[in-house]
């Protein structure tokens, strides 16, 4: 190759190198979502408040204030027990990890409990007494309920011998293996564990998305609160679905979708399992 030929090719090569460098920089640039539409926390970003071996965090609202919903987390160590107590308002507890030892009644009997594993959702009936403990692997719990749920004591007759460990008139536990799933038009599957997102009231729903499954851009009438139970979800904001302008969130991440904000989400090379909660209609 002659010198004159090289001189002719060199400018074009420089341009191509600049283009490729620009593409590489763009590919590596971090994606920033509109946090007024959708906020999130990675597992390492959750600011647990530790006290006497127990971690807690209010994600939304205030359980002491009546009239609104609240969302919170609780992490308890092995052999941590509550005294029998009640709550005056509706609430739902999802076991995220570990073993939740649940029971009902005014007298604590640690041999009369039901061991509930990850994926179990418990409905606690207002005004009914219950207590709980923690298995050897600890437990992490996700709560959604109506405000005013300060713990209190009440008078209730002792439970008669026999019968189930958990009185279903006081506490209803739905285990993952017993849930019935339906297939949505977009290829995902879901189960409405308690409530229904299309109707008024609190709801708790599980959603599973296969690999390479995406929603359209959409919005919700009310705030929605999501926990990644397994896999990785990719989330974006805005009215145009752009799979390259998303943030990947692994198991243990939390998402808050604000009412009427337009967003989208999907999966890439693996399935995802989501806990979806809120106040309907969604």
Task: Give the role of each language-model region.
Residues 77-78, 87-107, 210-213, 220-240:
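Glycine- and acidic-residue-biased ligand/ion/polar-headgroup-sensing regions
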Residues 106-127, 239-260:
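Short acidic-glycine-tyrosine-enriched beta hairpin
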Residues 126-150, 259-282:
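Ligand-binding loop in jelly-roll beta-barrel domains
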Residues 12-22:
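Bacterial N-terminal signal peptides
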Residues 82-84, 101-103, 124, 129-135, ...:
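Short beta-strand His + acidic residue motifs that chelate non-heme Fe in jelly-roll/DSBH
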Residues 70-87, 126, 203-220:
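Conserved short histidine dyad/triad with adjacent acidic residue
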Residues 2-14:
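Bacterial N-terminal signal peptides that target proteins for export
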Residues 27-70, 153-203:
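A short, N-terminal "cap"/entry segment at the start of jelly-roll beta-barrel domains
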């Amino acid at each position: 190759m002659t010198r004159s030929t090289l001189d002719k090719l060199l400018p074009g090569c420089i341009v191509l190198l600049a283009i490729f460098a620009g593409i590489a920089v763009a590919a590596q640039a971090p994606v920033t979502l509109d946090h007024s539409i959708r906020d999130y926390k990675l597992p390492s970003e959750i600011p647990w408040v530790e006290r006497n071996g127990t971690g807690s965090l209010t994600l939304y609202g205030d359980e002491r204030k009546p009239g609104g919903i609240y969302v919170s987390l609780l992490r308890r160590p092995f052999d941590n027990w509550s005294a029998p107590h009640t709550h005056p308002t509706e609430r739902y507890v999802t076991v995220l990890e570990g073993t939740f030892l649940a029971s009902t009644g005014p007298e604590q009997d640690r041999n009369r409990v039901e061991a509930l594993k990850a994926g179990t959702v418990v409905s606690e009936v207002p005004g009914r007494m219950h207590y709980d403990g923690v298995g050897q692997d600890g437990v992490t719990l996700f709560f959604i309920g109506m405000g005013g749920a300060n713990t209190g004591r009440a008078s209730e007759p002792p439970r008669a011998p026999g019968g189930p460990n958990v009185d279903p008139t006081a506490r209803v536990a739905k285990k993952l293996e017993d849930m019935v799933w339906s297939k949505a038009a977009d290829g995902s599957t879901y189960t409405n564990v308690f409530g229904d997102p299309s109707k008024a009231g609190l709801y708790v729903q599980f959603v599973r998305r296969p690999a390479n499954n995406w929603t359209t851009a959409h919005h919700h009438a009310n705030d929605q609160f999501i926990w990644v139970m397994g896999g990785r979800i990719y989330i974006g904001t805005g009215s145009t679905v752009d799979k390259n302008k998303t943030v990947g969130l692994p198991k243990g991440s939390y998402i808050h979708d604000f009412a009427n904000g337009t967003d989208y989400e999907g999966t890439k090379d693996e399935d995802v399992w989501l806990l979806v909660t809120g106040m309907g209609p969604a």
